[in-house]
Amino acid sequence: PGFEAGIDIKAKYTIFGEGCRGHLGKELIAKYELDKGKDPQHYGIGFKEVWKIKDENHEEGLVIHTNGWPSAKNTPAGSYLYHADNNEVYLGYVVPLDYENPYLSPFEEFQTWKTHPSIRPYLEGGERLTYGARALIKGGLQSLPSMEFPGGVLVGDNAGTLVFSKIKGSHTAMKS
């Protein structure tokens, strides 16, 4: 009970876009040695929230990128806050998964970041509408595996197309 047999995929060409460190992607990279001669991949965890804020706190088009605080010097975390239309802001925080402190809570770091004097005023009196978290692949071009193999191709985070330094993930996934 509860078991369902897998399916056979039969196609001339299959596009695999299952996200960061996807199960099939890992198997395909290993089977076809798509990462041969590449640097090891690096991973992070990212948190994102969408807020509805007061009209007087909203500056449509404003973009804030930060790095560092509240993370320790040896934990290169980064964050963003984007003012969108309709008095909404998108904010996020990314922490690499190779952090040294076993007591570090990336979620708590994100919550602390929102109290910074450059961030808090925008959120005061606002309401969080949605939130989420996900794994991120952030090794860069030197870690990017070959994306094509016999009968298929890897796309997006399955291949590692995120440009972490420029915070370009959706853009590069669509282009892949």
Short names for language-model regions:
Residues 1-121:
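Predominantly flavin-linked oxidoreductase catalytic cores and closely associated redox partners
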Residues 101-102, 106-176:
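FAD/FMN-dependent oxidoreductases across multiple families
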